[in-house]
Curated annotation (Swiss-Prot):
Disulfide bonds: none
Species the sequence originates in: Psychrobacter cryohalolentis (strain ATCC BAA-1226 / DSM 17306 / VKM B-2378 / K5)
GO cellular component labels: cytoplasm; ribonucleoprotein complex; ribosome
Highest taxon of the lineage: Bacteria
Name of protein: Large ribosomal subunit protein bL36
Keywords: Ribonucleoprotein, Ribosomal protein
Pfam families xrefs: Ribosomal_L36
Length: 38
């Protein structure tokens, strides 16, 4: 999980999810694409 100030989709499988006021990127195809804003 990368924690970054600015998160963006890396591939077509990445999805933007809001959890507890934070923005997360989840990816089913490539788990290394997981990110959290903050």
């Amino acid at each position: 999980m990368k924690v970054q100030a600015s998160v963006k989709k890396i591939c077509g499988s990445c999805k933007v999810v809001r959890r507890k006021g934070r923005v997360h990127i989840i990816c089913t195809a490539e788990p290394r694409h997981k990110q959290r804003q903050g």
